[in-house]
Amino acid sequence: TGKVEELLISERKKSPLLFVLIDSEVSQIDSAVKLAKDVEQIGAASILVGGSSATDQMEMAEVVKNLKSAVNIPIILFPGNITGVVPQADAILFSSLMNSENPYYITQAQALGAPNVLKFGLEPLPTSYLVIGEGTSAWFVGNVRGIPFDKPKIAAAYSLAAQFFGMRFVYLEAGSGAKTNVTPEMVATVRKVFQGFLIVGGGIRDSQTAKSLTDAGADALVIGTLLEDSKNLEKLTEIAKAIKN
């Protein structure tokens, strides 16, 4: 395991973690940098950069470069495609979208992106990316056969397969701006079998929801869309407090 992975695991021993997703397409550089500094103050453990619809590589590289010099917490790439592999980040969620119906998103994009991960010196975090439900960008772009929200055992079976493949991270994704979040029941069911680092994202908008997910066994929560409205930093502060208690 590399430095970023070790850092996340040691931070997790203290309390569940908060990851903030900055979509390089939505954020202007200045506002991205300001947001990153704010969330670092609030207690975010990492900034994820990417998203399923982010395709402008130059723009993303520029955002990453600026974020890297602005904050001390790790910058982790979260690519929706090979264009999301850019230099200067600390690590990358090297993800297979395991419930895609298109092999491109399961292994082909990964093969095309891998040489650049090596070239740029990015620490790969081997991740099974599972999209829950349907109707979101990730679902549409990734040709996903969405795991139904009320079928936690299916998510657990995929997570177990991921573990047997040697993946140390599972990311349960309801999708950006999702109307509902992954259920605590699904998180608990996955947690029973998956021994690695469990990330949950999509539709998390308040501290109650956040707390229910970390209580169920999530190691980290990803907050993204909520922060596209800057007035919601207060909500993030509440979420950060709730999951630390």
Question: Which residues does each PLM region occupy?
Answer:
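Hydrophobic faces of well-ordered beta-strands that scaffold small-molecule active sites
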Residues: 18-22, 47-49, 75-77, 92-94, ...
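Catalytic cores of alpha/beta
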Residues: 77, 81-94, 189-223
